[in-house]
Amino acid sequence: AGEYSLSQITMDDVDLTRKLKDTKLRVKAYYAYDSVSQCVLGASYSRDKDQNLVKECFRDMFRLIAKHGWGIPAGIEVENHLMSEYKYTLLQEGTVFSYVRYCAPLNSQEKQAENINGAKKRRIIHRNHVGIGRFYGKWKYRVESKKISDAGNDTWEDKQYYSFDELVADDRRDNYEWN
């Protein structure tokens, strides 16, 4: 982690907690956080976890940095699986960032962004939206849902579903409140 704000950023993907009306799936989000202040510097949203999601997050972050006239952070911490395409371009040390740290594959807890995602969920998202949690959760993190018997045996029916635009707008408001 850096010592000063905007000295290092950390990036991670997350599935939004509520589901879409049309597909009953979750919207994928990608965030860029400042490691020191933990502010969201960039966010992007998609129905699929792919390279466009990553590129749009970088664009959103760089637009914010340029808009305010801030300098480019010295370091970045990223995961392997979605960032390997940029290893010899954008994420080559010295190209944009002085220091690039790739976290170990299959070790998601290593990234600082994972902890920030969890803190934001506990402090903001649970408070702002009803019905968020797991059927096996404890206390306020437990939700009631209806089990659907099917071939996969892992389907649960939620009480309410949302449009893509509603979910993105709600998440952007949550990010604004988090910052």
Residue spans of the language-model regions?
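Globin-like tetrapyrrole-binding proteins
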Residues: 70-74, 80-179
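Short, well-ordered alpha-helical packing segments
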Residues: 27-30, 42-43, 55-63, 77, ...
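Mobile-element integrase/transposase regions
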Residues: 1-31, 39, 52-57, 63-64, ...
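Short His-Asn-centered micro-motif
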Residues: 11-13, 44, 77-80, 103
